[in-house]
């Protein structure tokens, strides 16, 4: 399987997002989850329901400003799924070229019914990213992408090869400016959860 196969669309009814596997963990942005909605992913032909109450770690901060005391991340244990993706334990450096990979729903016309369907196909979106600013040392990094991201891209990974440097958690509307929760901060959360 390719690295893109371990990055999947999260179907949340009225709330969409993206997440990915690192080892046997599934990672996404916490704000992807809306109250009262069932969120699920499809991986290896199987539907997996994500219940935030069963997360190893879950936090969805209030407001649009990233807060180092409230990381915007959800981490789930998915035993049996073993991804080759790994977390970087260091921050990317300014000017480093990275890729953000997302999946989006694609509206296609159903020939038989004559109506559009949003469930037929998923599109892989790759954005070339350059680190422009590193803030909060180990918690966040700010990037500028070559395509403007949208709300449904939240939770997608910032990568170099199979190494994940962060998770998309915020962006400035109508601009290529994005903020990623750093992998280094997520590794710290996982270690604390295993203590």
Question: What does each model-found stretch correspond to?
Answer:
Residues 5-14, 20-23, 30-139, 159-161:
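Serine endopeptidase catalytic core focused on the charge-relay Asp
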Residues 20-21, 146-169:
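Catalytic nucleophile loop of clan PA
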Residues 24, 50, 58, 181, ...:
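Intrinsic disorder/low-complexity segments, especially N-terminal tails and targeting/processing regions
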Residues 29-34, 105, 150-151, 165-175:
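Short beta->alpha transition motifs characteristic of CBS
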Residues 36, 153, 184:
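Solvent-exposed, flexible loop/coil residues
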Residues 165-195:
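C-terminal cap/linker of serine protease catalytic domains
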